[in-house]
């Protein structure tokens, strides 16, 4: 019992690999592979294939033994061992089992039909997208399985309406908006558009204000010598007082040049000015008083000049 054939027979008897029925194909595909069991089974299958390749004469006995075991209803069916594929290197091979199930698949319990799940994820959401006849690949084929699973997970996420993809698209759109160039405002004054209209309106308002101020000043301050009944009482009073002051100064200068005899009209005019400031009469009365004062001043001047003429003639 120390030959290789006996060891292989013992491995078949004590370490059987259960092959599920065709009804459990999808469930077996939905199960996750166990890495430890995969490594063990891969070593066993590689050793068995090498033994069969080196000893082709013993294949007949293996076939008879396998057929006798398949006849027993209490023992599971064993997959037929084939030769090593030519394209594999380093002892790795692709094993195709019954119904497209590889020998590395772990047995599925008949009592529990729900898929298992661990920390590395589950195949339950992606197993239905994989065809049931697709074999599990060993060695270099595991990378292809990972790629297929990643692609199927991406499609499952998009079908379930996950918000991850829209959020990434929105963030990309926001980044594009942040990189949009903004044109700075010009430094020069623009005389077109709303800004130019505002400038024109401001200038027009300033011009109109200046005109109104000039007109108001002209209306409030009439030129010297213009005294009418249409002007306000306070304005006429101020201009009358100013004119009287000028006239009294002129008369006082004339009388000082002529002599001290004619000082009386100046005093009278001063008293008359105080009377005009203190009185609240009508403008007509003030104008009459002013005319009387002027007449008196002219009479005094004529009398003075007449007296001088008489002195000269004497």
From Swiss-Prot:
PANTHER family: CHROMOSOME 4 OPEN READING FRAME 19. Keywords: Cell membrane, Membrane, Phosphoprotein, Tumor suppressor. It is a peripheral membrane protein. It holds the Pfam family DUF4699. Residues 281-291 have a biased composition (Acidic residues). This is PDCD10 and GCKIII kinases-associated protein 1. Induction: Markedly down-regulated in colorectal cancer tissues. Interacts with KEAP1; this interaction prevents the ubiquitination of KEAP1 by TRIM25, thus protecting KEAP1 from degradation. Found in association with PDCD10 and members of the STE20 kinases, such as STK24, STK25 and STK26. Residues 271-280 have a biased composition (Basic and acidic residues). Coiled coil: none annotated. The keyword Cell membrane applies. The modification Phosphothreonine is found at residue 106.
């Amino acid at each position: 019992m120390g030959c290789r054939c006996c060891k292989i027979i013992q491995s078949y008897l004590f370490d059987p690999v259960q092959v599920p029925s065709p009804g459990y194909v999808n469930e077996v595909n939905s199960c996750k592979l166990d890495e430890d069991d995969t490594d063990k089974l891969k070593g066993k299958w590689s050793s068995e294939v090498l033994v069969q390749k080196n000893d082709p004469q013993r294949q007949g006995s293996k076939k008879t033994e396998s057929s006798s075991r398949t006849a027993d209803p209490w023992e599971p069916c064993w997959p037929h061992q084939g030769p090593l594929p030519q394209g594999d290197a380093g002892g790795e091979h692709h094993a195709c089992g019954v119904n497209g199930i590889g020998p590395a698949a772990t047995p599925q319990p008949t009592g529990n039909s729900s898929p298992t799940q661990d920390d590395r994820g589950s195949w339950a959401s992606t197993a239905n997208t994989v065809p049931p006849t697709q074999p599990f690949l060993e060695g270099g084929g595991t990378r292809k399985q990972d790629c297929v699973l990643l692609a199927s997970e991406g499609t499952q996420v998009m079908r379930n309406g996950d918000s991850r993809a829209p959020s990434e698209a929105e963030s990309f759109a926001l980044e594009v908006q942040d990189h949009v160039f903004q044109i700075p405002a010009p430094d020069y004054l623009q005389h077109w558009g709303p800004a130019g209209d505002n400038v024109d309106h401001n200038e027009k308002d300033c011009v109109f204000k200046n005109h109104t101020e000039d007109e108001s000043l002209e209306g409030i301050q009439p030129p010297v010598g213009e005294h009418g009944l249409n002007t306000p009482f306070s304005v006429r009073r101020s201009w009358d007082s100013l004119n009287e002051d000028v006239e009294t100064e002129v008369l006082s200068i004339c009388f000082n040049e002529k002599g001290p005899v004619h000082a009386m009209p100046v005093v009278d005019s001063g008293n008359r000015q105080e009377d005009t400031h203190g009185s609240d009469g009508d403008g007509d009365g003030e104008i009459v008083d002013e005319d009387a004062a002027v007449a008196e001043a002219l009479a005094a001047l004529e009398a003075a000049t007449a007296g001088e003429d008489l002195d000269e003639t004497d």
